[in-house]
């Protein structure tokens, strides 16, 4: 009887310790996630020298990135197929 009570109490203590540790990690997780999001957001501030797929462009000015061409009809960068 004493051994089963001791094991039950030890199990509860272990459960408390594991729960506290995981809760502590969960509190740090949002901070880490936000810091990673803002670190990625810093790269968006840098401008490219060319325009990507779907960006508006002026035909004949070569504003689109390599492998893209400015569509004269739609006036946006599209994939250049070599035709």
Curated annotation (Swiss-Prot):
Stated name of the protein: Mu-theraphotoxin-Hhn2e
Propeptide residues, chain positions: 22-48
Protein family according to the UniProt entry: Belongs to the neurotoxin 10 (Hwtx-1) family. 15 (Hntx-3) subfamily.
A Pfam family per the record: Toxin_12
Localization (cell): Secreted
Functional description taken from the UniProt entry: Lethal neurotoxin. Selectively blocks tetrodotoxin-sensitive voltage-gated sodium channels (Nav). Does not affect tetrodotoxin-resistant voltage-gated sodium channels or calcium channels.
Domain notes: The presence of a 'disulfide through disulfide knot' structurally defines this protein as a knottin.
Organism: Cyriopagopus hainanus
Annotated InterPro entries: Huwentoxin-1 (IPR011696), Huwentoxin_CS1 (IPR013140)
Lineage: Eukaryota, Metazoa, Ecdysozoa, Arthropoda, Chelicerata
GO molecular function: ion channel inhibitor activity; sodium channel regulator activity; toxin activity
Positions of post-translational Leucine amide modification: 81
Gene Ontology terms: cellular component: extracellular region; host cell presynaptic membrane
Tissue expression profile of the protein: Expressed by the venom gland.
Keywords: Amidation, Disulfide bond, Ion channel impairing toxin, Knottin, Neurotoxin, Presynaptic neurotoxin, Secreted, Signal, Toxin, Voltage-gated sodium channel impairing toxin
Assembly and binders: Monomer.
Domain of life per record: Eukaryota
Disulfide bonds: 50-65, 57-70, 64-77
SUPFAM superfamilies attached to this UniProt entry: omega toxin-like
Signal peptide span: 1-21
């Amino acid at each position: 009887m004493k051994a089963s009570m001791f094991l039950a109490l030890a199990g509860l203590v272990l459960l408390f310790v594991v729960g506290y540790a995981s809760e502590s990690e969960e509190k740090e997780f949002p901070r880490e996630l936000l810091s990673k999001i803002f670190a990625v957001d810093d790269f968006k501030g840098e401008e490219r020298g060319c325009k990507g797929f779907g960006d508006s462009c002026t035909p004949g000015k070569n504003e689109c990135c390599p492998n893209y061409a400015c569509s004269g009809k739609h006036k946006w960068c599209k994939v250049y197929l070599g035709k």
